[in-house]
Amino acid sequence: MKLKFTKMHGAGNDFVVLDGYTQPLNLTETQVRALANRHFGVGADQLLVVEKPTVDGVDFRYRIFNCDGGEVEHCGNGARCFVKFVRDSRLTDKRSVRVQVQKGVITLTMQDNGEVVVDMGAPVFEPVQVPFDASGVEARREGNDTLYALEVNGETRWVSVVSMGNPHAVQVVDDVEAFPVLVDGPVIETHPRFPQRVNAGFMQIVGRSEVKLRVYERGAGETLACGTGACAAVAAGIRRGLLDAPVKVHTHGGTLTITWNGESASSLMMAGPAATVFEGEIELAD
């Protein structure tokens, strides 16, 4: 079948975006992998699908598929591209839209300067809700946060566990460029303490309102940016007493700004760019 698509990116985190709102889409995992393949397909970190909502009071349903074909709960950089896509495609003329994701509803707002602000929801730190199996794990308090000891490649890594609708393990490192992200990342991603796997974040503190971040994403590997990862890292840093909002998060793909008041019931707000790269049509095997 022939499929129209739009290639987009948010701070270098790149996506294939599909309109499932005006046409029925029911892609298989094999088809998702084919689209995301950088050699034989379009190429992307994730595939984003716009659909009609299945709950009342929202504008759209937002579905995210990793390049390995698996569906995931949330993607912050994709959310910014999502609102640009639905506006550019004239599916809505609203500047602010409410969007259904797997674990709730988020609000996306297009700014006059072209950046998008995303209400990312409140972070969750309770291990069982991340989910993280904390039974018998060595732990220590730092500020208002709890750090857990993970054995990774023969070393002990102290991580904060956070859910931003998807699971994250965040650690602070001295030099994020020199740190073995590509070695430790896949080990943390598949650590047995995380039953749904996990996104592994590596954060270098530059100043109280500035960090550098690399994220090894669950099912995608290291990406140029990760919006939920940026939020998880900032939330952990604020709880540990290391950061003050707003925080500039520098990734390999660009800079995101994260704001949070430190209250567990309060949403994090993420601001950053969204860009269309090109539109096209691809022949996809049934």
Swiss-Prot record:
A Gene Ontology term for the protein's cellular component: cytosol
UniProt binding sites for substrate: N13, Q46, N66, G76, N77, N166, N199, E217, R218, G227, T228
Alphabetized Gene3D superfamilies for the sequence: Diaminopimelate Epimerase, Chain A, domain 1 (3.10.310.10)
Pathway: Amino-acid biosynthesis; L-lysine biosynthesis via DAP pathway; DL-2,6-diaminopimelate from LL-2,6-diaminopimelate: step 1/1
Pfam families: DAP_epimerase
Keywords tagged on the record: Amino-acid biosynthesis, Cytoplasm, Isomerase, Lysine biosynthesis
InterPro entries named in the record: DAP_epimerase_AS (IPR018510), DAP_epimerase_DapF (IPR001653)
Compartments, record wording: Cytoplasm
Residues the record marks as active site: C75, C226
UniProt site (Could be important to modulate the pK values of the two catalytic cysteine residues): H168, E217
Catalysed conversion reaction: (2S,6S)-2,6-diaminopimelate = meso-2,6-diaminopimelate
Highest taxon of source: Bacteria
Primary location: cytoplasm
BP GO terms, sorted: lysine biosynthetic process via diaminopimelate
Record EC number: 5.1.1.7
Keyword match Lipoprotein: no
N-terminal signal peptide: none
GO molecular function, one term: diaminopimelate epimerase activity
Function description: Catalyzes the stereoinversion of LL-2,6-diaminopimelate (L,L-DAP) to meso-diaminopimelate (meso-DAP), a precursor of L-lysine and an essential component of the bacterial peptidoglycan.
Quaternary structure and interacting proteins, as annotated: Homodimer.
Family membership noted in the UniProt record: Belongs to the diaminopimelate epimerase family.
Record-linked NCBIfam families: DapF
The name this protein goes by in its record: Diaminopimelate epimerase
Organism (species): Paraburkholderia phymatum (strain DSM 17167 / CIP 108236 / LMG 21445 / STM815)
